[in-house]
């Protein structure tokens, strides 16, 4: 299986076919998001995602029924650095999906009431996520302060109120411009299907790109020079979030992915085994590897009993030091990652995201299904250990705790954290 790439009307068109499947995935990716925004329009990318989907509803009669009648699923998501709009469906409904996709490039045909209703839905999303008081919001500010990544994806209610339909339509043209869009097709699609899509794309009115957007963020003075301050936010339940700064240009991305997998993926994950399976301190956790072309942050969050905060942090430091010492099953984790990559061939949606992200959005090693190591996983245990030693240091660490400030022993936690650098 090989990736096919062509350019049509300024749009990069990528595909990887699998005729053995019963479905396809058709996605539009374009560079937008909070790292390309400023304080006066923060949240405009997320609003654009909503309005693009709302606009489709007005372009087709009984749009949601139309999707259901043809077994088509339509989704949108906004990240800090790009937007993805995805259509999944049965292989014989591809032409209908391409009609829908091409309508995303059309002018808005919504009225003021519909526009304001979508803003209200986003405001409800902001409230539902309790973003301003959340530990995630607090942590994000700590890690990305004074950089483009500090801004929230959802934006702010007052900023949303200031965005007009005309302003958003101008932003749409800027985003859906030549050399800023990728259309990716995976699953059971034929070359003839692709040719018909190319004809439709050629008919679209797409403006020239005025400013090339790159997937990098500024490096603040604090990045790689953390003071290991214990940041505490008042709250009833106790949550801990820990993250580490990463120099993205220093390591092969497969090393970072494997390190992330060792820590967080599946029942073999060290976080799961150390803190949940073996010691019953936590039930579950959330984790993320936030990456840009130059820097990134690997982080995780969990809830813990107020009487086990010190124990939890002690175990986290122990497992990080164990990785530095090579006390993990490299072979099992590497095999798992390679099998995950192989099995994505049978999941058009997951494959679509991975190929678009690793091969075209993030500047890193590309996935290559013609290679025994999929273009990425010809790495050694020593590389992973060396990366762990360099990344898991106090100078790269941000820690934030949400709980009762009066009952959290900062001194004890500081003493525990100091043992993180003992092996470096």
Predicted features along the sequence, with ranges:
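Charge-rich, well-structured scaffold segments of protease-associated domains
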Residues: 60-213, 246-247, 277-424
């Amino acid at each position: 299986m090989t990736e096919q790439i062509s350019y049509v009307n300024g749009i990069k068109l990528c595909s990887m076919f699998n005729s053995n499947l019963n479905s396809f995935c058709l996605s539009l990716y374009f560079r937008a998001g909070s790292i390309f925004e400023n304080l006066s329009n923060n949240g405009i990318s997320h609003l654009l995602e909503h309005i693009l989907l709302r606009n489709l509803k007005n372009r087709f009669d009984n749009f949601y029924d139309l999707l259901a009648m043809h077994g088509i699923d339509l989704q949108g998501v906004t990240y800090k650095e790009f937007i993805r709009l995805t259509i999944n469906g049965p292989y014989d409904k591809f032409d209908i999906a391409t009609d829908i996709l091409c309508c995303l490039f059309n002018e808005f045909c919504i009225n003021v009431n519909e526009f304001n209703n979508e803003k209200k839905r986003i405001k409800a999303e902001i409230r539902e996520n309790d973003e301003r008081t959340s530990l995630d919001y607090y942590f994000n500010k700590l890690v990305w302060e004074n950089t483009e990544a500090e801004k929230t994806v959802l934006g702010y209610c007052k900023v949303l109120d200031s965005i007009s339909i005309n302003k958003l339509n101008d932003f749409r043209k800027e985003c859906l411009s030549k050399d800023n869009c990728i259309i990716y097709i995976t699953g059971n699609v034929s070359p003839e299907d692709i040719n018909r899509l190319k004809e439709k794309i050629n008919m679209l009115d797409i403006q020239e790109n005025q400013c090339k957007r790159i997937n990098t963020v500024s490096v603040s003075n604090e990045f790689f020079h953390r003071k290991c301050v214990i940041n505490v936010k008042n709250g009833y339940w106790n949550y801990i979030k820990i993250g580490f700064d990463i120099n993205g240009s220093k390591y092969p991305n497969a090393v970072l992915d494997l390190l992330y997998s060792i820590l967080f993926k599946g029942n073999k994950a060290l976080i799961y085994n150390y803190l949940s399976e073996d010691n019953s301190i936590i039930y579950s956790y959330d984790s993320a590897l936030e990456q840009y072309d130059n820097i990134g942050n690997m982080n995780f969050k969990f809830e813990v009993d107020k009487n086990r905060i010190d124990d939890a942090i002690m175990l986290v430091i122990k497992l990080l030091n164990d990785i530095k010492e090579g006390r993990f099953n490299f072979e099992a984790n590497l095999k798992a990652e390679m099998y995950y990559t192989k099995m994505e061939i049978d999941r058009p949606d997951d494959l679509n995201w991975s190929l678009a992200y690793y091969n075209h959005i993030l500047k890193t090693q590309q996935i290559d299904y013609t290679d025994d190591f999929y273009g990425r996983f010809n790495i050694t245990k020593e590389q992973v250990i060396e990366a762990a030693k360099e990344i898991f240091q106090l100078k790269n660490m941000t820690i934030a705790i949400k709980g009762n400030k009066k009952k959290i022993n900062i001194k004890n936690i500081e003493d525990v954290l100091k043992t993180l650098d003992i092996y470096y």
